[in-house]
Design a protein with these regions (language model features):
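Extended alpha-helical scaffold segments
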Residues: 1-278
């Protein structure tokens, strides 16, 4: 019973380690020519190298199991000996192939660095374009419908996120290549500018909707305390945006913010009347 269990376990272990060797060689045979494949190649090579000692221990374990089985049975099937020799040869071959892969990674590095730099330059180009777009047209026109502006802002956000994903992806690959990449300050600045522009138009939209609801409601049915709280939030946001005005404008002024603030002041001026009648 013990011998059969040992034999079954040994067969399973031999089958598994042969599967791993086949998988590894298939990967190492495909030399990378594009950035993504190069990154995958490095990751696979690293994983294989880290697992190399474990494979050696598995090889030794199988060898020991065969030795024990031979002592228990007096002999062992020739096919098992053949499997063990095959595993030993495959392990030796793997050491050679891993060394070759290291050389391939080194040889391909300059080419891939050039390709990545080209991709990062494209990211920079889009960042400048999106920043320019954010500072013009309906994004800074106080007469535009907030719903239309917010729709376009959401589309712009999707495009910015694509560049963020690309930036992070190529930064990750550079790290795999043992290269450091400084934080993308221009992208971070663009994201802050976008967030403040989105915040402004979100509050413009909210204030207009609140004002419309208040206007349609019988004044005696209005809750002056709730309105006061809403107005305080609007006012607080305006103060925050004025402190970060450079995210909205290059000259320290933003017409959308100015009109929004004026609208808040006008409604705030009506609060004593609302409070007395509500």
């Amino acid at each position: 019973m013990y011998k059969e269990g040992l034999k079954g376990l040994m067969i399973e272990k031999m089958k598994e380690i042969k599967r791993v060797f086949a998988e590894y060689f298939a990967i190492l045979d495909n030399q990378p020519n594009i950035i993504k494949d190069y990154a995958d190649y490095i990751e696979h090579h690293t994983a294989m190298t880290n697992n190399n000692k474990n494979l050696e221990l598995q090889k030794i374990e199988i060898e020991n199991m065969q030795g024990l089985l031979k002592r228990l049975e007096g002999s062992i099937k020739p096919e098992y000996n053949g499997d063990l020799e095959y595993i030993k040869n495959q392990y030796s071959k793997l050491q050679v192939e891993l060394a070759k892969a290291s050389e391939i990674i080194k040889a391909k590095k300059p080419e891939m660095m050039t390709n990545i730099d080209r991709e990062m330059d494209t990211v920079k180009k889009y960042i400048k374009q999106y920043e320019s777009n954010l500072m013009k047209d309906k994004f800074v026109e106080e007469t535009c419908a907030p719903a239309d502006v917010l729709k376009e802002l959401n589309e712009l956000k999707r495009n910015i996120d694509k560049q963020r994903d690309k930036n992070d992806y190529f930064t990750k690959i550079r790290k795999l290549m043992d290269l450091t990449t400084p934080p993308n300050k221009d992208l971070a600045d663009l994201e802050m500018k976008y967030n403040d522009r989105k915040l402004l138009w979100t509050h413009v939209d909210k204030l207009l909707k609140c004002h419309e609801d208040w206007y349609k409601t019988n004044i005696r049915m209005l809750d002056s305390e709730d309105i006061q709280k809403e107005m305080q939030q609007f006012d607080s946001t305006v103060m925050q945006l004025k402190l970060r005005i450079n995210n909205l404008s290059q000259d320290g002024k933003d017409k959308v913010l100015e009109v929004h603030e004026a609208r808040i002041r006008k409604i705030a001026g009506l609060m004593p009347i609302i409070s007395s009648l509500a």
